[in-house]
């Protein structure tokens, strides 16, 4: 297989991994620490990720517990969670901040499915752009007489097959996440 196709395949695999990573931040009805990945807290004069100022655990299926290393960090942590837009209300007992994950409403679940579909489409476009870049490179190689016309058509076909494989992976991951979001 051509170096160009191998590189294209690697870039597509990275896109699928990035897609999975993005989807892990989409909230479902279950507690997941990854929904807090993007939250930053103002601590000691600088901005720090939430997981660097507290220990995050899941004591129950619908609860996340945050235990700050410094109890003075509880108010900034609560403030950061409220500002995050996740719709979570922190409850603190002076030592631990608890986040109860509420049951998602039907409307909220439908909105989240739309969000998943939108993210999936963005990554499909990214994968197709990678294919286009690879085909452009192959056409340049043909123009420079590095490959023959027959090789060009065969490699374009290989590029399309690889693209189809990664788009299918993306669709499977997307369908799985949509199903997870719609579970009551």
Curated annotation (Swiss-Prot):
GO terms for cellular component: cytoplasm. Pfam families: RRF. One of its GO terms (molecular function) is ribosomal large subunit binding. GO terms for biological process: translational termination. Keywords: Cytoplasm, Protein biosynthesis. It is found in: Cytoplasm. Responsible for the release of ribosomes from messenger RNA at the termination of protein biosynthesis. May increase the efficiency of translation by recycling ribosomes from one round of translation to another. This is Ribosome-recycling factor. It comes from Desulfotalea psychrophila (strain LSv54 / DSM 12343).
